[in-house]
From Swiss-Prot:
The modification N-acetylmethionine is found at residue 1. The gene is GLI3. Residues 703-726, 863-882 have a biased composition (Low complexity). There is a cross-link at residues 773, 779, 784, 800 (Glycyl lysine isopeptide (Lys-Gly) (interchain with G-Cter in ubiquitin)). This is Transcriptional activator GLI3. Changing residue 727 to R: In PAPA1 and PAPB. Its main location: nucleus. The modification Omega-N-methylarginine is found at residue 175. Gene3D superfamilies: Classic Zinc Finger. Changing residue 903 to A: Loss of proteolytic processing.
């Protein structure tokens, strides 16, 4: 094969040479190729090396046969590996793609890249008569000379394969050479895999290594050598592409799929690379040959039936081709070649195919939108031949080296424009924008400059002033003499000079950053920072410290950003996608995209030469810079200010206003983020986008792709475009702030997504331009509404208004709603949707209208950006990291792992803490949000979370129905909702989710101890038994329960409390989730939590936690209604139901406390939480409800904050309202506890004074109004306790409800609280005393827990003393822990933390709590770990210790307890009740919380109790799948948060801090906790 390929290469080369000789046009191309080659050689090592480096470039033929030989060998090796890797990488699952290694190389070469491949493929090409004529016209085709074309064709065929593997259009493209047999990839020895990889890698490398490679890619199809075939074959090929473009429906579908898979970017990259490889070798025949060989392989593969492929999915082929061309570099490369070498062929091709022509026209109309997008597309268009050079260059820009662009273009008059318009031309080859590519500038430092310009245009644009300089570093300068004012030192090397300048002049200047270089055009204008001066000095010294690390690439840049941009040529990354509706063109830098958009999609030339007397205007800043530098001299560089004036790209009107703006800001593109910084621009951008939509009604989506793809670089409009187009654009989400779309765009998933998805989007848009436009308009309207945020969301999410409402309504708690990021409130008070909101909505929107570009883009990115829907994977991760929120976990899960860009962007998003919005949301949250959005808008449900399948139904439901707003019955509350997507709402419900409240419902609290199944079964008997036996009746007892249940869960009636079976709220997703959860529980699927990713678990927990923590104080008091409360709780057993109840209770009981709880929002670290806790304790009733589940319920505020995540919007908020009224606070609180206390409640009810049945005990205890008050606090505490049992106490269920620590504990606590007035002091002092004291004295971290817990406990204790001991005695830690939680609030709230609780108990508990981290779980195991005076106390202590350890609330509570005047228990309780909020605020608590989270994870079921505690920490984990790590991370974030708000509900604070955990050692703590939890589970 290699021999063949070599000979092929040789022949090809000869042909190429001949062609060059034959055609002047070819000669032109040849020159370009030479220039390219030169550039490549200059910038990079010899082409061969370069190729070698990019083994994938095998497709390209080396310049020499030897080179080819080498290439084939090396590429074979590397390429195979890389191909495989890439396939795997991009193709997370592309079964159909065959092994690339041997087939790839072998096929490529075996199939005489030209001949073997050509014939078989060309016959199929004949399918496209339009294309075929060119093939016949050029015999080379059949001769095998038209190797390049075949390469492109195979990809087309591959496209079909792509259909099979939409995710990897490129891969299918090549790998699936037998596109029909995706699996036949290997079947085709032409090695579809390698072709895929090769083209992709080659493309990437070619981009990086040398524009020439890009060109080579282009050359592949249009290499000068193959000018004849190139002309014919490429023309034919392009014709086909154009044709296909017209019919790109199939491929569009595939592409969207690919985009959805997150491989859109890669696909586009690959396609571009393929194109590039095939058609972008105007510079080096050898390289093109290689690429051709590679491409030929697939195409030449006999198995690859082009005809069939075309017939099967002509659109797919077109799309692939287009996408290929779309790639900035491929496009440019091809365009460049196309112009020069294929001019005639292209003309012929176009004319030859009527369909082609039609497509042509379509493309033209889409213009470079599509064609331009695919550098060679314009060539496809008849006009393309006219401006072949120019066009290729536009395509080249990204791929082409500066030299290539400048040299090649410089060769031909058009080339020059091409260089400048390398991107521009790509965009608008027809415009024949002769961007005066000052070959001199570009050529002088082609690598640094040309590349910079194009790939680095973004970078250059970013640092306009300096970048300008950088870009303007025209010649390769190598200064060795210092020309600083007053210094004339001479050095032997540039390095010495640089060292001298940096040390003697720059550093010596201290804070005066002025360039005093003689004749410096800056005229000693000071820089803002020293680094800017340092970088600037490189213009004078010629230093280029940033060298390309790719093998064979010798490019070096003075600016790191330029290097990064250049590296995209090697990686093939093209994050900047044309924002135009039908244009799938992607670029490696925003500058190129801006050029393309301004040139192709707009006649606007926003960049005006400011030099007096000069009237020149340009579409992009790089062209303007070149003009100024070339025409007016290096001294007349354009300043940033000028650019600003110039780039007022206020082209909102501009068709690609958004793009143009985004690009035009081209300079901003560089800083699209930087310059987009114009927040005003962001705003205006949106308007512009809308305007642009109007202007380009045809391509409203065009803008959209840009937001994601170009958004970061481009810009302001792009994000706006996103907004307007998608109604919500991913980039916005990324940005974290609507205003700073630029920043958002930088991180936006859409960027990458757009790369991937944009192609699909564009294809889709093209396919259905009218429909897409219409959809776009609809989306725009929607977006406008959404931008109104609340107005829009509410309307959009009426069905699941609760979910959305909380997002919106959580203005205060909105952050909590986002649970992952307090600041993340999706629809908080912001006038616009937060970036996350936008992203979420956008994703949902996209789902709704996949046809629309945005939709398509999202289809691409939808999966890849599960977590940060708006971010590509990379961006999403950035957002996630930045957020430090549970969302992190979901980033990987939600987003398509395969989507490279998506991954990269998602990581960026995760890193940028500034994006609290959707990005901050955990995958589950985002999924919920999306699901809600979809439900509201009637769009398709969001893509299920990655791990959803393995989640039990209940878990899935929990995720889906995160908030499970009663009104919001997301159709796919279970699967449809993405775990990561589940917006804030799901979280409230999330409480329940812990899973899923079904089996887990009872065990929630004990879940950590008990693993899912165990927890389900075991807790079910004790807890569930209590819940089922007692709780159902209790639940049924009150409509309040029902209201609670309805709101948050399906157990509106007592009967449904834990069972959820009879959910009075069938419509709400929550109910569905509850039912599902119950089913799962019944099926012992509680393990779901165990199986659920840590992120998901955390998310669920955080939802629950919010409720618990916030409601704990009042939850206990609410427990006063435990009798019916437990039932209610049972109903709320599900997070939503619970949350709803909690909300109500919170509102009713202690608004102050409630609010306090709210501050405990997941992300909130403010001590306000602690204060709220205090309030909560004071107003036990309001938090008393299931703080675990509904922040809002227990503490109107607290609940909401957490609920947004858990119960969030629907569950949390609505329940708050409903539950509040129905339950009158305490009872409602109890209901809230019901998720944990449902069982608990039953236990309490049934076993009023039963030590094991602490919950029942509590319930049984007499409840008085005061008790109710206490119950409120106790209820909240109970909720917390529920959460706690979930943690370490799960095993240590002290109450009779070991089954559902959360619910049991909650119910118990509620019961206690109910009895608190009467016997709350007793029980509280005993149980709570133990638990509380244990926590309080135990450790500072546990204090919080202790306080909250102790408070609940104390109330409970004081109320049902026997219960407390019973709880302690009870072996089920989860319950005990839950009780503790309940107690603390109870005690603090109700009996005023009955001082009855012995100091010893408190102290013991405190002591125990001190080691709660470990003791927590251990405590669960050994209920009496800390020989407490009271068995119950001990248990409670253990339980609470566990709980608080995890919550890290004990220590603070302890401290607080110390402050209390009552016995330690009493004091602690009081402190807890009084300082519940304080506890929330303490960091120790949160730290403990971290552990708590871990524990809760262990006890997946416990999560209900732990919701508040664990939700925060575990929230991310839920999605992540790795419990310990995610939790640790989340907890770490929690830690920070924990510190602040943990008192009232350590868990809510934890939830908040989960994402922003400040405690770095939390991971170890969490790990140990997880281990402990496991141990406890085992013990249990």
């Amino acid at each position: 094969m290699e021999a063949q390929s070599h000979s092929s290469t040789t022949t090809e080369k000869k042909k190429v040479e001949n062609s060059i000789v034959k055609c002047s046009t070819r000669t032109d191309v040849s020159e370009k190729a030479v220039a390219s080659s030169t550039t490549s050689n200059e910038d990079e090592s010899p082409g061969q090396t370069y190729h070698r480096e990019r083994r994938n470039a095998i497709t390209m033929q080396p310049q020499n046969v030897q080179g080819l030989s080498k290439v084939s060998e090396e590429p074979s090796t590397s390429s195979d590996e890389r191909a495989s890797l890439i396939k795997k990488e991009i193709h997370g699952s592309l079964p159909h793609v065959a092994e690339p290694s041997v087939p790839y190389r072998g096929t490529v070469f075996a199939m005489d890249p030209r001949n073997g491949y050509m014939e078989p493929h060309y016959h199929p090409p004949h399918l496209f008569p339009a294309f075929h004529p060119p093939v016949p016209i050029d015999a080379r085709h059949h001769e095998g000379r038209y190797h390049y074309d075949p390469s492109p064709i195979p990809p087309l065929h591959m496209t079909s394969a792509l259909s099979s593997s939409p995710t990897y259009p490129d891969l299918p493209f090549i790998r699936i050479s037998p596109h029909r047999n995706p699996t036949a990839a290997s079947e085709s020895p032409f090695s579809p895999p390698h072709p895929y990889i090769n083209p992709y890698m080659d493309y990437i490398r070619s981009l990086h290594s040398s524009p020439s490679l890009s060109m080579i890619s282009a050359t592949r199809g249009l290499s000068p050598t193959d000018a004849p075939h190139a002309g014919v074959s490429p023309a034919e090929y392009y014709h086909q592409m154009a044709l296909l473009t017209g019919q790109r429906s199939p491929y569009a579908d595939i592409i969207p799929s690919a985009a959805t898979a997150g491989t859109g970017a890669i696909h586009m990259e690959y396609l571009h690379a393929m194109d590039s490889t095939r058609f972008s070798s105007p510079r080096l025949s050898a390289r093109p040959s290689r690429k051709r060989t590679l491409s030929i392989s697939p195409l030449s593969d006999h198995s690859f039936d082009l005809q069939t492929m075309i017939r099967t999915s002509p659109n797919s082929l077109v799309t692939i081709l287009n996408n290929s061309r779309s790639s900035s570099s491929a496009s440019g490369s091809y365009g460049h070649l196309s112009a020069s070498a294929i001019s005639p062929a292209l003309s012929f091709t176009y004319s030859s195919a009527p369909v082609s022509l039609h497509m042509h026209q379509q493309i033209l109309s889409r213009q470079q939108s599509l064609g331009s997008a695919f550098g060679h597309s314009p060539p496809l268009i008849h006009p393309a031949p006219t401006f072949p050079t120019q066009r290729p260059i536009p395509g080249i820009p990204t791929v082409l080296n500066p030299v290539q662009v400048s040299s090649g273009p410089s060769e031909s008059s058009q080339n020059k424009p091409t260089s400048e318009s390398a991107v521009s031309s790509t965009g608008d080859p027809m415009h024949n924008k002769r961007s005066k590519i000052k070959p001199d500038e570009d050529l002088p430092s082609p690598g640094a400059r040309g590349q910079q310009e194009q790939p680095e245009g973004t970078t250059l644009v970013k640092e306009e002033g300096d970048k300008d300089e950088s870009k303007q570093e025209p010649e390769v300068i190598y200064e060795t003499n210092c020309h600083w004012e007053g210094c004339a030192r001479e050095f032997d090397t540039q390095e010495q000079l640089v060292h001298h300048i940096n040390n003697d002049h720059i550093h010596g200047e201290k804070k005066e950053f002025v360039c005093r270089w003689l004749d410096c055009s800056r005229e000693q204008k000071p820089f803002k920072a020293q680094y800017m001066l340092v970088v600037h000095m490189r213009r004078h010294t010629g230093e280029k410290p940033h060298k390309c690390t790719f093998e064979g690439c010798t490019k070096a840049y003075s600016r790191l950003e330029n290097l990064k941009t250049h590296l995209r040529s090697h990686t093939g990354e093209k994050p900047y996608v044309c924002e135009h509706e039908g244009c799938n063109k992607a670029f490696s830098n925003a500058s190129d995209r801006a050029k393309h958009q301004n040139r192709t999609h707009s006649n606007e030339k926003p960049y005006v030469c400011k030099i007096p007397g000069c009237t020149k205007r340009y579409t992009d800043p790089s062209s303007l810079r070149k003009h100024v530098k070339t025409v007016h001299g290096p001294e007349a560089h354009v300043t940033k200010k000028q650019r600003g004036d110039i780039h007022p790209r206020p082209p909102p009107p501009r068709d690609s206003g958004s793009h143009s703006q985004s690009r035009s800001p081209g300079r901003p593109t560089q800083g699209a983020l930087g310059e987009q910084q114009d927040l005003s621009n962001t705003t205006s951008k949106r308007e512009e986008c809308l305007q642009v939509k109007t202007v380009k009604a045809e391509k409203p989506m065009t803008s959209q792709p840009s937001p994601g793809g170009q958004s970061s670089c481009s810009s302001q409009q792009s994000p706006i475009s996103n907004y307007s187009n998608s109604g919500l654009e991913l980039p916005l989400t990324d940005g974290g702030s609507i205003g700073d779309l630029s920043a958002i765009d930088e991180t936006p998933i859409m960027d990458s997504t757009i790369s991937t998805a944009t192609t699909a989007l564009a294809l889709q848009a093209r396919r259905n331009p009218a429909g897409t436009k219409w959809m776009e308009h609809v989306k725009l309207e929607r977006l406008k509404q959404v931008n109104g945020m609340f107005p829009r969301l509410n309307p959009i999410l009426p069905p699941k208004a609760p979910a959305v409402s909380p997002l919106i309504g959580n203005g205060t708690q909105s952050n909590n709603t986002c649970s992952l990021g307090g600041p993340m409130t999706l629809l908080p008070g912001r006038s616009d949707l937060s970036g996350v909101d936008v992203t979420m909505l956008n994703m949902l929107n996209r789902r709704d209208s996949s046809a629309s570009t945005i939709s398509s883009a999202y289809l691409s990115s939808r999966r890849s950006s599960g977590i940060s829907p708006c971010f590509s994977s990379r961006r999403s991760s950035e957002a996630s990291q930045a957020e430090g929120r549970p969302q992190n976990v979901s980033v990987a899960d939600s987003y398509d792992p395969i989507s490279t860009d998506a991954s990269r962007r998602s990581s960026e998003a995760s890193q940028s803490d500034g994006l609290p919005s959707l990005l901050s949301l955990t995958p589950a949250q985002q999924y919920r949000l999306k699901a809600k959005y979809a439900a509201a808008t009637g769009g398709p449900p969001p893509t299920p979370l990655p791990n959803m399948e393995r989640m039990s139904l209940k878990t899935r439901l929990a995720l889906l129905g995160d908030a499970l707003e009663p009104g919001v019955a997301l159709p796919p509350v279970h699967a449809p909702r993405r775990c990561s997507d589940g917006g804030a709402h799901g979280y409230g419900r999330r409480h329940l989710q812990p899973h899923d409240a079904p089996g887990h419902g009872v065990r929630r609290a004990s879940d950590p101890v008990r693993t899912g199944s165990e927890g389900l079964a075991l807790p079910r008997v004790p807890r569930f038994s209590s819940l089922s036996s007692c709780n159902p009746p209790a639940m049924a007892t009150s409509a309040e329960k029902r209201s609670l249940v309805l709101q948050n869960y399906t157990r509106p009636e007592g009967g449904q409390s834990r069972n959820f079976h009879s959910s009075p709220c069938p419509p709400s997703i929550t109910e569905n989730v509850t039912l599902e959860s119950l089913t799962m529980d019944a099926d012992a699927n509680l393990n779901d939590e165990d199986f659920l990713p840590d992120d998901v678990v955390q998310y669920l927990n955080s939802q629950n936690q919010a409720g618990y923590e916030q409601h704990f104080p009042s939850a206990l008091p609410d427990d006063s209604k435990v009798p019916h409360g437990p039932g209610d709780f049972d109903a709320p057993g599900l997070p939503d139901s619970h949350a709803g109840q909690q909300f109500h209770a919170l509102e009713q009981p202690c608004p102050e406390g409630s609010k306090t709880d709210l501050p405990i929002q997941w992300n909130e670290v403010s001590s306000g939480s602690a204060d709220l806790s205090s309030s909560k304790l004071k107003c036990g009733p309001r938090p008393a409800v299931p703080q675990t589940r509904a922040f809002g319920f227990c503490n109107g505020m607290v609940v909401h904050p957490q609920n947004p995540l858990r119960s969030g919007p629907a569950g949390g908020y609505q329940t708050l309202g409903e539950n509040s009224n129905p339950y009158g606070g305490p009872e409602h609180l109890m209901l809230h506890n019901s998720p944990g206390s449902g069982t608990s409640g039953n236990a309490f009810h049934e076993q009023p004074c039963k030590a094991p049945q602490y919950g029942n005990c509590l319930n049984r205890q007499p409840v008085a109004p005061g008790a109710l008050d206490g119950a409120c606090g106790a209820g909240i505490q109970a909720s917390k306790l529920k959460s706690t049992p979930m943690q370490g106490s799960g095993g240590q269920l002290n109450f009779g409800l070991p089954v559902a620590p959360n619910e049991s504990a909650g119910s118990m606590v509620n019961g206690m609280q109910n009895q608190d007035p009467v016997g709350q002091g007793y029980l509280a002092h005993q149980l709570l005393g133990d638990s509380m004291q244990h926590p309080g004295a135990g450790r500072p971290g546990q204090q919080m827990l202790g306080q909250i817990s102790a408070t609940s406990h104390i109330n409970i204790y004081q109320g049902p003393e026997s219960c407390l001991p019973g709880a302690h005695g009870m072996g089920s830690q989860p319950s005990s822990l839950a009780v503790v939680r309940g107690y603390q609030p109870c005690a603090s709230f109700g009996g005023s933390r009955r001082q009855a609780m012995p100091r010893d108990s408190l102290a013991l508990q405190s002591g125990q709590l001190s080691d709660t981290s470990q003791t927590c779980r251990v405590n669960g195991i050994k209920m009496e770990m800390k020989g407490q005076p009271h068995p119950l106390c001990s248990n409670l202590q253990n339980y609470s210790g566990q709980f608080y350890d995890q919550t890290v609330g004990f220590s603070q509570q302890d401290t607080k307890a110390g402050s209390f005047s009552i016995s330690d228990a009493s004091c602690l309780l009081q402190g807890t009740s009084a300082k519940n909020s304080e506890l929330l605020s303490p960091g120790a608590n949160q730290v403990t919380s971290t552990v708590d989270s871990l524990d809760s994870h262990d006890l997946e079921g416990v999560q209900i109790d732990f919701d508040a505690i664990i939700d925060d920490g575990d929230h991310s984990s839920l999605m992540s799948g790795a419990l310990s790590p995610s939790i640790i991370q989340n907890l770490s974030h929690s830690s920070s948060r924990l510190t602040t708000p943990r008192a009232s509900l350590p868990f809510p604070a934890l939830s908040m801090s989960t994402t922003n955990m400040a405690i770095g050692d939390m991971s170890s703590l969490l790990t140990s906790l997880a281990e402990e939890s496991k141990f406890l589970a085992v013990m249990q």
